[in-house]
Amino acid sequence: MENVKNFLNLFVDYLQIERNCSQYTTVNYATDIKEFYVFMNEEGIGELRDITYQDIRLYLTKLHQKEFARTYISRKISSLRSYFKFLLREKYLQENPFSLVSLPKKEQRIPNFFYEDDLNELFSLSDLSTPLGQRDQALLELLYATGIRVSECCDIRLQDLDMYLDTVLVNGKGKKQRYVPFGSFAHEKLKLYLEDGRITLLNKQNNHHDMLFVNHRGGPLTTRGVRHVLNELIKKTSKTLHIHPHMFRHTFATHLLNGGADLRSVQELLGHAHLSSTQVYTHVSKEHLRKSYLSHHPRA
């Protein structure tokens, strides 16, 4: 096989410099492309210019056989379509076989979100007498208060946080910035963490940096670290919830819209480029539906 590593490196540079993609997006693109190279090796395809539409159909069939979600397969198609388009632009290829491939129809699933009882229990689990407990509580409160992505949360620096106006400057997808407010609960827990827990964690190994959230060694907290925090907290409950960090974002949007917030405002807070991305949250909770039913049905 040709030296595909050079092509991938050029594409990564293109994503970062010309398209201004975030590191998270760039890593996803690179991962999808590397996995496609594995498929090429398995099928004995030596060069990218040898890829045919039939090869792509075989690749997609294998993905479907592994029962991956449609969103996962769509992402892979988008990544490879962009990569081959780039190679076409660089005149390495004469045509883009992925241009013939349509994206799978999106599944209309209701996003998973927390009910208030679940949230309250989750918020009660952190031990506020410890530095890590203070960090965990501040982290959970900020995720729910702002609806920011976990990657955005891990990128927050001290100078991005305005404790006077209770706002945070968020660096979103495509390096687009937005200000997002947070409330009194998040303010209180952030203040405790900043004045106590964070300092203690940084001093453990004489670490000094300006990232807001830190790990147990005092280094910057990663997205994997956030998942670990949630997994450890859920072990302390009797619930069998399968939770992931993005559920705070789903919950933020759902609770705002159920509470009467307008769609455009929620779109801006979430940092969505398209309103259609926000409309997925216009579902209503079962509790909200039941209250509406009991209030209005004549034989309820």
Per-region residue spans from a language model:
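Conserved catalytic core of the tyrosine transesterase superfamily
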Residues: 1-300
